[in-house]
């Protein structure tokens, strides 16, 4: 465990060491409001995990794709090793990409997922709200599962997109269940119509397609179950000590709880620690405001590991700076005396 001294009143350790120690974790999501240091935190956590795990994959699901900027290295849809590491890889994907893009890029792989539906069935499938994005998410999960990494860290999009991203498995399950119900009611008629029009691509019939979709539903159901298992999945909230960020964090934690997704760690970034002899009035005023919201965080989340990270004088970009920042996730920053 960390060398930090834990107070005698059993306040939880102000580090992410417990996440590193939890060897059963398979999925780790890092999320928060835009501009709070979410990508820096996810990169830093992945670096720490790479010290204790055989293989780590860092995935950006944020359309802004800041991983490339953080490490100074270009990443894309295929996982590639991060320079200077032999067990830490990264990739940048967009789970909200249209299914048309996926089908154009996926070829046979898309067929295997059950996407060879033909125009009519595509229209039927995508008439269900959220299924377009959920199918894209399914493709992402299939890629990730096939890569066999020991632990996967998701650098998620800003708060609203994060929560929608985590709903995808449930949305897809409901959508496929609805399609299955429709097929049982209208299957014979649809088969007749499709037969008259030359059938589905590859000589498939409707039953073949629905069988593939049922297989897909089972895969998504399995992942959904894993997401709700605290031994396998956790969510790290990132915020700053300001009202709007704290409000977003509380809303996010409530929603995560409603999805039965574990969350027990909060990283508070960009904290000011002016020395007692500081002549910076703005720094002192901001520190006073931050202390107010830090106190609220400690009261609201007394059963969370709350990590306090300082505002640095330089951007945290590049391997060396990220490694220094990541060290403070497990060895708490010691501020000067105020």
Swiss-Prot record:
The active site is at residue 62. Its main location: cytoplasm. The keyword Secreted does not apply. It is an enzyme of class 3 (hydrolase). Keywords: ATP-binding, Cytoplasm, Endoplasmic reticulum, Hydrolase, Metal-binding, Nucleotide-binding, Transport, Zinc. One of its GO terms (biological process) is cellular response to oxidative stress. The keyword Cytoplasm applies. ATP binds at residues 33-40, 242, 269. Its EC number is 3.6.-.-. It is found in: Cytoplasm; Endoplasmic reticulum. Gene3D superfamilies: P-loop containing nucleotide triphosphate hydrolases. Homodimer. ATPase required for the post-translational delivery of tail-anchored (TA) proteins to the endoplasmic reticulum. Recognizes and selectively binds the transmembrane domain of TA proteins in the cytosol. This complex then targets to the endoplasmic reticulum by membrane-bound receptors, where the tail-anchored protein is released for insertion. This process is regulated by ATP binding and hydrolysis. ATP binding drives the homodimer towards the closed dimer state, facilitating recognition of newly synthesized TA membrane proteins. ATP hydrolysis is required for insertion. HAMAP family: Asna1_Get3 (MF_03112). This is ATPase GET3. It comes from Uncinocarpus reesii (strain UAMH 1704). The lineage of its organism: Eukaryota, Fungi, Dikarya, Ascomycota, Pezizomycotina. The gene is GET3.
């Amino acid at each position: 465990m960390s060398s930090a001294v834990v107070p005698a009143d059993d306040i939880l350790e102000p580090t992410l060491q417990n996440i590193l120690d939890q060897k059963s974790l398979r999925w780790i999501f890092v999320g928060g409001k835009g501009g709070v240091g979410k990508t820096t935190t996810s990169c830093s956590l992945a670096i720490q995990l790479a010290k204790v795990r055989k293989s780590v994959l860092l995935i950006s699901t944020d359309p802004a794709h800041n991983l490339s900027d953080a490490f100074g290295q270009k990443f894309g849809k295929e996982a590639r090793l991060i320079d200077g590491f032999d067990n830490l890889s990264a990739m940048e994907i967009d789970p909200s990409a249209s299914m048309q893009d996926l089908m154009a890029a996926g070829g046979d792989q898309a067929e295997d997922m059950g996407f060879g539906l033909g125009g009519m069935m595509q229209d039927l499938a995508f008439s269900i709200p959220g299924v377009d994005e959920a199918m894209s998410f399914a493709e992402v999960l299939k890629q990730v599962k096939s890569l066999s990494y020991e632990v996967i860290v998701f650098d998620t999009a800003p708060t609203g997109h994060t929560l929608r991203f985590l709903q995808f498995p449930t949305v897809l399950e409901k959508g496929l269940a609805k399609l299955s119900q429709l097929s049982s009611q209208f299957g014979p008629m649809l088969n007749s119509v499709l037969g008259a029009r030359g059938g589905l691509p590859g000589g498939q019939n409707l039953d073949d397609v629905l069988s593939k979709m049922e297989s897909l539903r089972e895969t998504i159901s399995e992942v959904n179950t894993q997401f709700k298992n605290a031994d396998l999945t956790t969510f790290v909230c990132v915020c700053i000590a300001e009202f709007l960020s704290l409000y977003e964090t509380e809303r996010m934690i409530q929603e995560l709880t409603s999805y039965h997704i574990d969350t027990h760690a909060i990283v508070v970034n960009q904290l000011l620690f002016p020395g007692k002899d500081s002549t910076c009035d703005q720094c002192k005023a901001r520190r006073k405001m931050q202390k107010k919201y830090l106190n609220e965080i400690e009261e609201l989340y007394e059963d969370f590991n709350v990590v306090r990270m300082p505002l640095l004088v330089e951007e945290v970009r590049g391997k060396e700076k990220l490694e220094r920042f990541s060290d403070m996730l497990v060895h708490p920053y010691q501020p000067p005396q105020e």
